[in-house]
Amino acid sequence: MWHRVSIGVATALGLILLAGPEENAAEDSVQQAAVAAGKAALPVPRFVSLKSDKVNVRKGPSTDQSIVWVFSRAGLPVEVIAESDNWRRVRDSEGADGWVFHSLLSARRTVLVTPWSKGEERIPLYGSKSTSSRAVADLQSGVLGSVLECDGEWCQVSVDDYSGYVLQDRLWGVYRGEEVK
């Protein structure tokens, strides 16, 4: 699996860091305050991203539980599918799930471009919300991007030095029809 490293396996993976921690400090502090207050006012399921390039995924919601793998890509989107105190059960784009401590997750929204596609398919990053508009870049499957906004059909994303629009159903990290502001 290209974004998880099993314990005992040394795999070099490229990192893509799209935003600094200060950009999302306000979002993260709101999320942490809600959790600290014992109010899980956040919906489950929901998408979040990894804060670090080393995130231990455990069999259960405790440091006493064994580490089953390690995520090694900061910014990777994961889906929170359950909560237990300060632990979040997350699922990755390949469907694998496990438990992660809440402070290793960020409310910053990120996406993977067609992670289910195994071919050389390229997804256009359009200059506007139209398939007839000019493509500013072609994105490979598995490219990580930051979500700027989504309207339920299109998402405006930034990838490296490029910004543009991708059809929402070509992305993992946002729900079909979801609006993100």
Model regions and ranges:
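Extracellular/periplasmic metallocenter environments
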Residues: 156
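Bacterial N-terminal signal peptides that target proteins for export
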Residues: 1-9
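Bacterial N-terminal signal peptides
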Residues: 8-16
